[in-house]
Amino acid sequence: MQHLVLIGFMGSGKSSLAQELGLALNLEVLDTDMIISERVGLSVRGIFEELGEDNFRMFEKNLIDELKMLKNPHVISTGGGIIMHDNFKGLGTTFYLKMDFETIIKRLSKKEREKRPLLNNLTQAKELFEKRQALYEKNASFIINAQGGLKKSLKQALQFIA
């Protein structure tokens, strides 16, 4: 079995689904944003503000190479922009959590949105969302309709794996 890699726009439920998949399949769960935050000692927002997005993307790209070296399969929850890296391909079996922009914004509280620097300007965030959708679809082994909530997303993911 390869890594099970969850991709999708920020707020689409990747972290929550990763936890549930990990439990269901008895696999360790890794979260790329959390790993980077712990290593740098700053939140993702802090990294963006103090070190810049380019440095965050460099940390992310280096982490992809590290994850490819792991022997055992993991469930990996990724940051929304991870698919922009040329070394992303081959990380594992990818599941795109597809959800419309309006639903994502409704799901995230104001406090949650404040943690995500790329959601500061909703017009720009929607443009980014639309730009990335094609990349998510292109890089997806499977597409999960995440509109129906966590239980339905988990059921779809497990059916794809079976």
From Swiss-Prot:
Name of the coding gene: aroK
Cofactor note text: Binds 1 Mg(2+) ion per subunit.
Annotated CDD domains: SK (cd00464)
Alphabetized InterPro entries for the sequence: P-loop_NTPase, Shikimate/glucono_kinase, Shikimate_kinase/TSH1, Shikimate_kinase_CS
GO molecular function terms attached to this record: ATP binding; magnesium ion binding; shikimate kinase activity
Subunit structure: Monomer.
Involved pathway(s): Metabolic intermediate biosynthesis; chorismate biosynthesis; chorismate from D-erythrose 4-phosphate and phosphoenolpyruvate: step 5/7
Family: Belongs to the shikimate kinase family.
SUPFAM superfamilies recorded: P-loop containing nucleoside triphosphate hydrolases
Keyword terms: Amino-acid biosynthesis, Aromatic amino acid biosynthesis, ATP-binding, Cytoplasm, Kinase, Magnesium, Metal-binding, Nucleotide-binding, Transferase
Species the sequence originates in: Helicobacter acinonychis (strain Sheeba)
Subcellular location field: Cytoplasm
Entry annotated with the keyword Magnesium: yes
Pfam families registered for this protein in UniProt: SKI
Cofactor field: Mg(2+)
Lineage, uppermost ranks: Bacteria, Pseudomonadati, Campylobacterota, Epsilonproteobacteria, Campylobacterales
Protein name: Shikimate kinase
Residues binding Mg(2+), per UniProt: S15
EC top class named in words: transferase
Stated role: Catalyzes the specific phosphorylation of the 3-hydroxyl group of shikimic acid using ATP as a cosubstrate.
One record GO biological process: aromatic amino acid family biosynthetic process
Gene Ontology CC annotations of this record: cytosol
Top-level lineage group: Bacteria
Catalytic activity: shikimate + ATP = 3-phosphoshikimate + ADP + H(+)
Main location: cytoplasm
Residues that hold substrate according to the record: D33, R57, G80, R132
Binding site for ATP: G11, S12, G13, K14, S15, S16, R116
EC number(s) from the headed UniProt entry: 2.7.1.71
